């Protein structure tokens, strides 16, 4: 039976950050809400916390980083997680290491991947990521399909005046590779909304979604956040598009059923908060670990609440007017 927080939200999945190291330097990366300090969890510690979490009803895991495939023990970690999780195990990756290990990841128990591709244009890709590895990322999409790590999702963070015009080509790439395209809103906490970088690159996805909705031939709904998945036809087939819009979105928070694990061994109750983190690294007693899990769940609270969404338009309008 799942465990519920004070707001009636069940905890059904874990989002496990394996590291903070990455071979990209995307300027908008939130690093799963952590800094680069701290010793990483061992495979044994990860398995222990997954085992305990499963006892409380967790049966789905997302692996993240940093870049999780930079860990030499990634195959072992996936295998240990699979011992206890019969549901979906997925991983978010930039894909640069994936062609070499995709089949081994699948064999170990990984079900599918999200691959980050924030522009199909080499120069814009370089500006965003600081690398020239776009060809390796595209190869990773193909390798993931070949290995059966499907459905592949392509993560595309939409950035004002930078990659918005790349969306039509991204739709083609997704259709060519039978992948789902996730258009993701640039996300930050309340304090970050006033930063020059956020105001320069954040754009509301509502107008883009309205255009896609008009052209869609069908719609499905995502289980996690009850968000729509649009089906569109193009010259390369049918493509599915999801919009991830967490910024000042109380509905997004209301449907959150995920508990996060930081790479340094903490239960993290919310991406946008660190003051409610519950450390567990070094705890080997399973009863104590169960207590810490319960404490973390009791501290879960929606970051965005009803009333916050009104400020979305105010923030957006202010940013637009000041950028003119």
Swiss-Prot record:
It comes from Thermoplasma acidophilum (strain ATCC 25905 / DSM 1728 / JCM 9062 / NBRC 15155 / AMRC-C165). Keywords: 4Fe-4S, GTP-binding, Iron, Iron-sulfur, Lyase, Metal-binding, Molybdenum cofactor biosynthesis, Nucleotide-binding, S-adenosyl-L-methionine. Residues 6-234 form the Radical SAM core domain. Its cofactor is [4Fe-4S] cluster. It catalyses: GTP + AH2 + S-adenosyl-L-methionine = (8S)-3',8-cyclo-7,8-dihydroguanosine 5'-triphosphate + 5'-deoxyadenosine + L-methionine + A + H(+). GTP binds at residues 15, 62, 92, 153, 258-260. [4Fe-4S] cluster 1 binds at residues 22, 26, 29. S-adenosyl-L-methionine binds at residues 66, 116. Binds 2 [4Fe-4S] clusters. Binds 1 [4Fe-4S] cluster coordinated with 3 cysteines and an exchangeable S-adenosyl-L-methionine and 1 [4Fe-4S] cluster coordinated with 3 cysteines and the GTP-derived substrate. GO terms for molecular function: 4 iron, 4 sulfur cluster binding; cyclic pyranopterin monophosphate synthase activity; GTP 3',8'-cyclase activity; GTP binding; metal ion binding; S-adenosyl-L-methionine binding. It is an enzyme of class 4 (lyase). It comes from the Archaea. Belongs to the radical SAM superfamily. MoaA family. PROSITE patterns: MOAA_NIFB_PQQE, RADICAL_SAM. [4Fe-4S] cluster 2 binds at residues 253, 256, 270. This is Probable GTP 3',8-cyclase. CDD domains: Radical_SAM, Twitch_MoaA. Pathway: Cofactor biosynthesis; molybdopterin biosynthesis. The gene is moaA. GO terms for biological process: Mo-molybdopterin cofactor biosynthetic process. Its EC number is 4.1.99.22. InterPro entries: Aldolase_TIM, Elp3/MiaA/NifB-like_rSAM, MoaA_arc, MoaA_NifB_PqqE_Fe-S-bd_CS, MoaA_twitch, MoCo_biosynth_MoaA/MoaC, rSAM. Catalyzes the cyclization of GTP to (8S)-3',8-cyclo-7,8-dihydroguanosine 5'-triphosphate.
């Amino acid at each position: 039976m799942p465990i519920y927080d004070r707001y009636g939200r069940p905890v059904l999945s874990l989002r496990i950050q394996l590291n903070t190291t990455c071979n990209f330097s995307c300027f908008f990366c939130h690093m799963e809400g952590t800094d680069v300090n701290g010793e990483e969890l061992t495979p044994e510690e990860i398995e222990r916390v997954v085992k305990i979490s499963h006892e409380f009803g967790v049966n789905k895991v997302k692996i993240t980083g940093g870049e999780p495939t930079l860990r030499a023990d990634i195959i072992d970690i996936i295998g240990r997680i699979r011992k206890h999780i019969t549901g979906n195990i997925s991983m978010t990756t930039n894909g640069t290491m994936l062609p070499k290990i995709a089949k081994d990841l699948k064999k170990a128990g990984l079900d599918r991947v999200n691959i980050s591709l924030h522009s199909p244009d080499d120069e814009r890709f370089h500006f965003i990521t600081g690398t020239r590895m776009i060809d390796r990322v595209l190869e990773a999409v193909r390798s993931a399909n070949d290995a059966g790590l499907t459905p592949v999702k392509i993560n595309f963070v939409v950035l004002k005046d930078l990659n918005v015009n790349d969306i039509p080509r991204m739709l083609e790439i997704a259709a060519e590779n039978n992948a789902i395209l996730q258009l993701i809103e640039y996300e930050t906490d309340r304090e970050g909304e006033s930063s020059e970088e956020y105001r320069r690159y954040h754009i509301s996805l509502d107008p883009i979604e309205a255009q896609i909705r008009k052209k869609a031939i069908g719609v499905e709904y995502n289980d996690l956040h009850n968000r729509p998945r649009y089906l569109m036809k193009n010259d390369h087939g049918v493509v599915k598009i999801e919009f991830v819009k967490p910024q000042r979105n109380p509905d997004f928070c209301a449907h959150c059923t995920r508990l996060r694990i930081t790479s340094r061994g903490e239960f993290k109750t919310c991406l946008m908060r660190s003051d409610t983190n519950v450390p567990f690294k070094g705890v080997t007693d399973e009863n104590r670990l169960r207590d810490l899990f319960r404490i973390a769940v009791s501290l879960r609270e929606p970051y965005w609440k009803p009333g916050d969404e009104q400020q979305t338009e105010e923030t957006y309008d202010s940013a637009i007017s000041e950028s003119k």
